[in-house]
């Protein structure tokens, strides 16, 4: 008999839910949750499907995740078709197996087992699911959180099923994430002929000292939970493509991954002061993708660590490394937020896969977390 976690994961992987498409994944989950007494509230925005589901009342533990996946790349490089889930040598292959349809299956089956064992559980169990995490992430969790906050919805704990693990399930737990802010800088000059530089003003030449200082700056030293803030230049663009034209404008895009030692407003102030010191003629636009968040300690961290230790006998590392996740939006509700999911070695890659045994373990861990917090 096939494991219910693996069976559900396969059903979800079969759905080609390229972001922001859901391709029917949420309907599968909704039917399973409704069957065990959950109230389902669709919260769709634009081209994105979301739902908020809950059972019980009181102190609230939510499980959050996304049904959308990234593109497959060249399918001829896959050992088996990416939307035909295949088990080989104990590994479940398919796009989304690790990020994050395996986690979704583990959550649903954990909820079914938990409700069967604790039909009158004392707290509230909830699900916050979106199809817009991998792409723009503008009509997904952020909009759901805004709607829930507007009506003063309670959220005490949130477990995000992102693939947090490195070598074995549960070895890494994310108890926070760095903030992310991007600068789109345009430095203005005067276009001209390269043979007559005195009649032009080359913005690339003007910008170089400022960019050198930008790169050399140590923005902070981090703290006990976060590494030092990182600034990386991502894109540069200037010129017409001709070798005899001095460009009239120089575009530079750079990104900060910042710790709780900095704020987005402080970053903006320091960058503007640096550019002004170099007397540049510029325009600057900022895009804030997310604030840093941290759950340093608390009942959720304790429950997650205990669940991992119970099933693996390893003590997970609590880290804040990696990119952003939807946890950055959920933390705005004042909830304790922790990420626990499968091994992330193959996410977004050709031949994405996850250990079938790990998914079974993960589901038991999720159930154990439920039992500790709201049984």
From Swiss-Prot:
Entry EC no(s): 3.5.1.18
Cofactors, names only: Zn(2+); Co(2+)
Top-level taxonomic group: Bacteria
GO MF terms held by the record: acetylornithine deacetylase activity; cobalt ion binding; succinyl-diaminopimelate desuccinylase activity; zinc ion binding
EC primary class: hydrolase
GO biological process: diaminopimelate biosynthetic process; L-arginine biosynthetic process; lysine biosynthetic process via diaminopimelate
Binding site for Zn(2+) 2: 99, 134, 348
Protein's pathway: Amino-acid biosynthesis; L-lysine biosynthesis via DAP pathway; LL-2,6-diaminopimelate from (S)-tetrahydrodipicolinate (succinylase route): step 3/3
UniProtKB keywords: Amino-acid biosynthesis, Cobalt, Diaminopimelate biosynthesis, Hydrolase, Lysine biosynthesis, Metal-binding, Zinc
Cofactor binding comment, as recorded: Binds 2 Zn(2+) or Co(2+) ions per subunit.
InterPro entries recorded: ArgE/DapE_CS, Bact_exopeptidase_dim_dom, DapE_proteobac, Peptidase_M20, Peptidase_M20_dimer, Peptidase_M20A
Residues that, per the record, bind Zn(2+) 1: 66, 99, 162
Catalytic activity: N-succinyl-(2S,6S)-2,6-diaminopimelate + H2O = (2S,6S)-2,6-diaminopimelate + succinate
Active site: 68, 133 (proton acceptor)
A Pfam family hit: M20_dimer
Subunit structure: Homodimer.
PANTHER family: ACETYLORNITHINE DEACETYLASE, N-ACETYL-L-CITRULLINE DEACETYLASE
Protein family per UniProt: Belongs to the peptidase M20A family. DapE subfamily.
Role of this protein: Catalyzes the hydrolysis of N-succinyl-L,L-diaminopimelic acid (SDAP), forming succinate and LL-2,6-diaminopimelate (DAP), an intermediate involved in the bacterial biosynthesis of lysine and meso-diaminopimelic acid, an essential component of bacterial cell walls.
Protein name: Succinyl-diaminopimelate desuccinylase
């Amino acid at each position: 008999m096939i494991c219910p976690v693996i069976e559900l994961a396969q059903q979800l992987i079969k759905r080609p839910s390229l972001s922001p498409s859901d391709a029917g994944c949420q309907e599968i989950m909704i039917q399973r949750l409704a069957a065990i007494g959950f109230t389902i509230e669709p919260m769709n925005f634009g081209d994105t499907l979301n739902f908020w589901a809950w059972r019980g009342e009181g102190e609230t533990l939510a499980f959050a995740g996304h049904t959308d996946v990234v593109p497959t790349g060249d399918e001829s490089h896959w050992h088996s078709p990416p939307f035909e889930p295949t088990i080989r040598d104990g590994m479940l292959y398919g796009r989304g197996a690790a990020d994050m349809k395996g986690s979704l299956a583990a959550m649903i089956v954990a909820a079914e087992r938990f409700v069967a064992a604790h039909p009158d559980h004392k707290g509230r169990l909830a699900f916050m699911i979106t199809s817009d995490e991998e792409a723009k992430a503008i009509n997904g969790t952020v909009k759901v959180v805004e709607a829930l906050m507007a009506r003063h919805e309670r959220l005490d704990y949130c477990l995000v099923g992102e693939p947090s693990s490195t070598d074995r399930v549960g070895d890494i737990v994310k108890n926070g994430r760095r903030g992310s802010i991007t600068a789109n800088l345009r430095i203005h000059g005067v276009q001209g002929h390269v043979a007559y530089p005195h009649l032009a003003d080359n913005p690339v030449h003007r910008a170089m000292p400022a960019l050198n200082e930008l790169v050399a700056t140590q923005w902070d030293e981090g703290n006990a939970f976060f590494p030092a803030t990182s600034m990386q230049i991502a894109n540069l663009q200037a010129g017409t493509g001709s070798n005899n034209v001095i460009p009239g404008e120089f575009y530079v895009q750079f990104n900060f991954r910042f710790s709780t030692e900095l704020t987005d407003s402080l970053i903006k102030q320091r960058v503007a002061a640096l550019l002004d010191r170099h007397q540049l003629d510029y325009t600057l636009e900022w895009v804030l993708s997310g604030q840093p968040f941290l759950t340093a300690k608390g009942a959720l961290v304790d429950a997650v660590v205990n669940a991992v230790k119970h099933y693996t006998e390893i003590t997970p590392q609590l880290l804040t490394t990696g990119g952003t996740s939807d946890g950055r939006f959920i933390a705005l509700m004042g909830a304790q937020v922790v990420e626990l999911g499968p091994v992330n070695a193959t996410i977004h890659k050709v031949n994405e896969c996850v250990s079938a045994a790990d998914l079974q373990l993960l589901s038991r861990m999720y159930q154990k977390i439920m039992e500790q917090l709201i049984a």
